[in-house]
């Protein structure tokens, strides 16, 4: 069973925190901004799969934003990793994001499962959508929140690469190549 979700990791926004400080000297987080000519993105999109049985988070950052084509690439990557450790089924628990319920993703899961059944090998996917407006039911959500608190920089601005590396370090997983869709050739 795996809980899937996407998360934006901002280089600028600060998470809500609670902390102790000396009386009369409150702890402060510095809000930053970037110049208009900064080539790095203000935020990074990341797909994650939380596997409670393995006590692991699998992450892949995305060049761009979450879309159906990237979603299928992420799920395929997860299936490859699960097959390598001897699993047969992925019960995929995720929300009703448009890129999860799209025709492209539903068709891909159907084709994938038919190919697994025909070949007799691979990972079968059972898609379980959470009720709408119920993100707290996804076990990965608290992990994102705690991760954001672990990677933030109190008084500096992280670069996109450093932010991605800190996120992967916080979740004790490798920083893999970012997922992207191939450029359309005209």
Predicted regions and their residues:
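Short, basic/hydrophobic alpha-helical segments
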Residues: 71-91
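Extended, low-complexity cationic-aromatic segments
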Residues: 1-77
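Conserved Walker B catalytic segment
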Residues: 105-113
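C-terminal anion-handling pockets and recognition modules
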Residues: 123-124, 133-186
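Acidic/histidine-rich, metal-coordinating catalytic segments
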Residues: 5, 87-101, 130, 138
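A short acidic (Asp/Glu
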Residues: 12-15, 102-106, 140
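RNase H-like polynucleotidyl transferase catalytic core
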Residues: 23-37, 112-142, 155-156
